Amino acid sequence: IYYQGSKGSYSESVLLEMFPDSELISCKTFQDVSINASNDGFGLLPIENSLVGTVIEAYESLIEYELEIFLEVKKKINHALIGLAGTQKQNLKKIISHPQALQQCSKYLNKLDVELQPVFDTAGGVLSLLNTKSEEIGAIAGEHFDNDERFTIIEKNISNHEENYTRFFLTGKTPPPIKEDKNLRSAILVAQDEPGSLLKALTVFDVLKLNLTKLESRPILGSPWEYKFYVDYQNSDTKIDQLLKDNLGQVAKEFKILGKYGSINL
């Protein structure tokens, strides 16, 4: 199973808890995860955070490499400010982390007089402190680093809100043997470029009594001012899925189901 980030990342922690016997392979980017998962095995992608929204790069890589969603995993995120052993908060001049983590802790960081530097993943940022050997640089990552004597947890619970969760998708080309009820759907919808087209498409969901849980517009690359929609809805009946596709085919330019899956809370 491929994941983005270094050892100690949130993605790795999800996989260690869910699939402890699987081979886990770290990748530098979300695109690398999707490329590898399209050829061999599976990929885990963080898709949405409850504080800052959709992880666009991850979602787009899933779509680009035509991966299927097999499972949703929701994990509570507990960000901490971390430094080398002995580092004190008042001595910090720079804090590094993944851009998502910096966003999720923006209220806390705005109170500090420090430089913020984005890096490619949370755990990698912490591990890079070992190379700097500086007590003027801190990193934001998971609280599980308190088990490593090389580092010190300067402050815990620094997210903008205590209820901070991330949705992860397990993706790939070939379905794994997963037992969870497949009662959730994710899809891409492209409405016709005419007045009322989105309303017509949404009316189809209403007529079929489907509960929409996500609707988010994104620009279509190469088509300025045209938009696609990320759509999540609840359904466990494949016959209803087919009715939905048939009816939307009459009023929308494109509709594609990206996955039929269940959900697990960690």
Regions found by a protein language model. Name each.
Residues I1-L266:
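Domain-level signature for soluble enzymes in the chorismate/prephenate branch of the shikimate pathway
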